[in-house]
Each structure stands twice: as structure tokens, then as C-alpha cells.
């Protein structure tokens, strides 16, 4: 659902994130973080009926619920690489675990995290982590503007390729399928997402 952002600091936060995408030094990491919550392990009670000429795939509407999982995910903007882990919970502890994983995956150089305003992203534990890891800095998107976070593009792809038409007989199968997809995604010789949003108020030369 689209919501217009009424954040009083919208422009300042937006420009802060966009300057990372367009102007951050090339040797600095830009890592987008978020949680993909509510991934349902739905098992279809009957197999899909194959596509035929003039007729799309047909799917039985009945399914068995096996629970939900959450992907704690990170996306390296410049390298087009996904990393993360699947969890049954999403809270401050799991977010700090994600920060630890990002730090392990990128052991050298300065870096920037982009994330939304979920309360778990701005707790004392997170602030303590940032204080203990001064080479990393945190950048928040404006309220109701998570579309500025490039990991949402990756999450959308995961949803279409893995979840929408998937049938999972257990949480373990869903977990494994998501894990396998991250490996497949990173192995593809595709370029990073081509980010095109540029505020009209910005001089074009600033983005070249």
C-alpha cells in the first residue's frame, strides 16, 4: 500500500540516502537492511494444473498452514549481493545479529547502513553496536518512504520467485528454499539495480 510521507524531515532524510547511492566514495560499502516478515509456509492441498493453450496455470485455493518465518536481509548496493538469515522472530536481538553478519561479510573499509524507522532499528542495543563499530554509520529513510531502501527491490523479487507460487510442506522447507535462492541470486551475472529516482530540486551535475 502506498502512503504519502508526512515526515517533517522527509527531504533531509531522502537526500541523505540518495547522496549515498550517488555520491558515496567508491571504496565505502552501502548496505540496505530490512526484515521480510510474514513469509508463510503454505502447502497446497492439490498440485497446480499445468498451463494449456489459451489457459493459464490453475491453482487449488485450499492450503495447509505450517507457520511463518522472517528473512533478516541485507543488500550490498554496489555489488548486487544479498545476505541474511531466516528467523522465527524479528526484534532488536535479531537485528543486531544482522548487523554482526553485515560486519563479518564486509570486514574492511567504512560502510553505511540504510534502513527504515522500525523501533527495533534504533534501540540502545543498536546504538551500542554502532558505538563499538565506528566504521559503520546508520541512515534512516523517511517515515512511509521505505521505497528508498533498495533491499525492497530484492524482497519483491524473492516474493515473486519463491513465495507467490511456492508450496512448502514445512517451515524447514521454506527456510531452505529461501537460503538456496539467496545463493542463486548472488551467482547471477547481473548488474546492480539501476537507481533512477532523482529529486527535481537537485542540479543534474550533482549526480554525474
Model-derived features: positions:
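Short Lys/Arg-enriched helix C-cap and helix-to-coil transition segments
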Residues: 1-13
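C-terminal domain-tail junction helix/linker
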Residues: 3-6, 173-208
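Extended, low-complexity cationic-aromatic segments
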Residues: 14-96, 192, 199-207
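Short beta-strand segments
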Residues: 31-33, 112-115, 139-141, 196-197
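RNase H-like polynucleotidyl transferase catalytic core
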Residues: 58-63, 132-150, 166-168
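Active-site proximal helix-loop segment of RNase H-like, two-metal nucleases, encompassing DDE(D)
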Residues: 82, 151-173, 184
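Short, basic/hydrophobic alpha-helical segments
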Residues: 93-112
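Acidic/histidine-rich, metal-coordinating catalytic segments
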Residues: 109-121
Amino acid at each position: 500500500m502506498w502512503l504519502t510521507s508526512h515526515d517533517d524531515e522527509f527531504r533531509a532524510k531522502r537526500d541523505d540516502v540518495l547522496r549515498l547511492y550517488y555520491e558515496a566514495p567508491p571504496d565505502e560499502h552501502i548496505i540496505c537492511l530490512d526484515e521480510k516478515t510474514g513469509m508463510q509456509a503454505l502447502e497446497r492441498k492439490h498440485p497446480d494444473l499445468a498451463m494449456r493453450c489459451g489457459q493459464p496455470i490453475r491453482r487449488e485455493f485450499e492450503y495447509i498452514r505450517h507457520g511463518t518465518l522472517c528473512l533478516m536481509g541485507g543488500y550490498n548496493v554496489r555489488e548486487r549481493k544479498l545476505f541474511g538469515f531466516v528467523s522465527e522472530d524479528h526484534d532488536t536481538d535479531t537485528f543486531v545479529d544482522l548487523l554482526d553478519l553485515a560486519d563479518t561479510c564486509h570486514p574492511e573499509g567504512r560502510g553505511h547502513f540504510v534502513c527504515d524507522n522500525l523501533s527495533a532499528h534504533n534501540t540502545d542495543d543498536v546504538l551500542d553496536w554502532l558505538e563499538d563499530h565506528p566504521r559503520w554509520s546508520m541512515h534512516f529513510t523517511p517515515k512511509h518512504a521505505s521505497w528508498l531502501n533498495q533491499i525492497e527491490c530484492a524482497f519483491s523479487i524473492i516474493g515473486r520467485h519463491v513465495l507467490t507460487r511456492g508450496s512448502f510442506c514445512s517451515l524447514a522447507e521454506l527456510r531452505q528454499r529461501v537460503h538456496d535462492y539467496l545463493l542463486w541470486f548472488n551467482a547471477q551475472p547481473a548488474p546492480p539495480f539501476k537507481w533512477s529516482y532523482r529529486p527535481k530540486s537537485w542540479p543534474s551535475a550533482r549526480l554525474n
